[in-house]
């Protein structure tokens, strides 16, 4: 199975996406009341900001962009060095949500305004319940992605060097958006960062290390 997935990285990502979405849907259906409401004093000092919806939604684009960029432009080992801890951390977060269901009571009572930003926040609140929050997957993924940009040597070339500081800015912006939109507590943020740092130091296996060239025929056998 491992050898097959190492030769079919796109299929590996597709299988994991299916697993993740199914697991998250199960959590949303079966865990309606959290055991713990996550909160700290710092949460009360952070104002709500509807404009933070922009970097928050950018997260959904950044993940597949980075994965496919490394898959096609970087040595295959760089792709797996991001993919394995990224998916492992998301799975650990899901397990945490099952073991200790967490939730939030931080959102504003009403989001005022008819502008695009206010409408987007209302749409987010309507579709994303304030449950299963600690650790923050948004934060974990952002930190893990940023570290991949600073690890891979392809971003040392002049034409790509700008992508490293850009990834840092985007990472910080996404993390800030989670608390500015009241989607997460600072505690969720801290544990998301900690999870990313711990998994980054783990001894990950080198999948398909014999393939050191970027992916040209990702689904070839």
Role assignments for model-derived ranges:
Residues 27-42, 72-158, 210-219:
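Membrane-interface loops
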Residues 107-111, 129-134, 173-200:
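Interfacial helix-loop-helix junctions of multi-pass membrane proteins
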Residues 47-61, 126-148, 186, 190:
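Membrane-interface loop-to-helix entry segments
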Residues 62-67, 144-148, 169-177:
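Hydrophobic, membrane-inserted alpha-helices
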Residues 159-172:
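Short hydrophobic alpha-helices at membrane interfaces in multi-pass membrane enzymes
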Residues 185, 191-221:
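C-terminal membrane module of polytopic membrane proteins
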Residues 21-26, 90-99, 169-179:
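Aromatic-anchored segments of alpha-helical transmembrane domains
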Residues 1-65, 109-112, 221:
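N-terminal transmembrane-helix/juxtamembrane module of multi-pass inner/ER membrane proteins
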